Amino acid sequence: MEESNRSSTVLFDKYNIGRLLGTGNFAKVYHGTEISTGDDVAIKVIKKDHVFKRRGMMEQIEREIAVMRLLRHPNVVELREVMATKKKIFFVMEYVNGGELFEMIDRDGKLPEDLARKYFQQLISAVDFCHSRGVFHRDIKPENLLLDGEGDLKVTDFGLSALMMPEGLGGRRGSSDDLLHTRCGTPAYVAPEVLRNKGYDGAMADIWSCGIVLYALLAGFLPFIDENVMTLYTKIFKAECEFPPWFSLESKELLSRLLVPDPEQRISMSEIKMIPWFRKNFTPSVAFSIDETIPSPPEPPTKKKKKDLNEKEDDGASPRSFNAFQFITSMSSGFDLSNLFEIKRKPKRMFTSKFPAKSVKERLETAAREMDMRVKHVKDCKMKLQRRTEGRKGRLSVTAEVFEVAPEVSVVEFCKTSGDTLEYYLFCEDDVRPALKDIVWSWQGDDDEDDVTTNDNVDTNDNKINNVS
């Protein structure tokens, strides 16, 4: 019996898994239904043995999870949950039932300019948001742009995406900090600088691909087409394309600035948003804060026990302590699926110091004031730091708390409370690291030698799902 005709099966008592929607290079995607709500979902199933056999596959899966965790936007397909058994990994994602934008173009040909503009506006909103989180898609094409039941665009397939984090968060420092060096994507949509394979700006490469998509929406075909690959590359390098006569003057002017071979001369995201053609009937999409995606559950009520007469009230005058388990798990990084089952509510950074907590706290406060941050003491070993200037999403606010592991060992934890997540990461790496290097013993994750580890501390009851393969 074909997999697409199999009866529904149950995954972890939470989802009914139904028909096969599609098959990729190393995954199968099924239609599913959340049992408690009846909501439709898409479930990507990956066999672990396929992951371990293929070099770089674990890294790719880890990257896709990390990327999609950062992105909560109405025009980006949402990753809802990650689960695993001994043999399989399951991505539970938003189900988008309107099909691919590619299918619409293939079926209907060119779109009316107003409809093409709407999809381009939503694409730019989504891609600009991704860039603000440090994510470059690198494979933007109509096949990776889906349409929902309301006719709105959704960006999907982050398997090739590059997550640009500062050093210590997965990125690397060097003379070409901001350049990517992996040739990804589909040739007809790929920017000239990517094809040259000499390093490129991921944001500008995505903008080129957005230009290709806009051309395809308006024309019904691609701007650069040739059966000979080398001839195709030559056309892309020179941006040799013709505009059909039905293109409006305004759309041609925008495309002429999008499809520029030199990325330094190519139009930027902020400039695109100022173009009158783009702004016509534009309604900005409202992104969701990553901190608001899943609220923290309320603490269960507990009975207050009577205090011993000799027991002191916790007035916050001394630092909280870390036990050994908390310390080890907090300072460890690497690919651990069990860490991916919970939505991370607050982006955190942490370092250890061989100085007493009191000394660390004083040094931290001095450094914050030198960085022109407002400092407010929440309690004796916890403070709130706030930038005086507005950032991309308001003023960056961070809490810093000092914990005592031993009399001469302290842990400092930074946690973003408001503002832009990428701005927060850059604050930790570019401002805090240099300012506190004299007291830091080790930053979280810096000592990990293996980028990929395995962990079987997950639900291993494979009998809960029998028919998905």
UniProtKB/Swiss-Prot annotation:
Catalytic reaction(s) noted: L-seryl-[protein] + ATP = O-phospho-L-seryl-[protein] + ADP + H(+); L-threonyl-[protein] + ATP = O-phospho-L-threonyl-[protein] + ADP + H(+)
Annotated region (Activation loop), positions in chain: 157-193
Chain ranges of the NAF domain: 317-342
Active-site residues, as the UniProt record annotates them: 139 (proton acceptor)
Keywords, alphabetical: ATP-binding, Kinase, Manganese, Nucleotide-binding, Phosphoprotein, Serine/threonine-protein kinase, Transferase
Region PPI, residue ranges: 346-376
Needed co-factor(s): Mn(2+)
Residue span(s) of domain Protein kinase: 15-278
Family per similarity comment: Belongs to the protein kinase superfamily. CAMK Ser/Thr protein kinase family. SNF1 subfamily.
Protein task: CIPK serine-threonine protein kinases interact with CBL proteins. Binding of a CBL protein to the regulatory NAF domain of CIPK protein lead to the activation of the kinase in a calcium-dependent manner. Downstream of CBL1, CBL2, CBL3 and CBL9, regulates by phosphorylation the K(+) conductance and uptake of AKT1.
Name used for this protein in its record: CBL-interacting serine/threonine-protein kinase 16
Lineage: Eukaryota, Viridiplantae, Streptophyta, Embryophyta, Tracheophyta
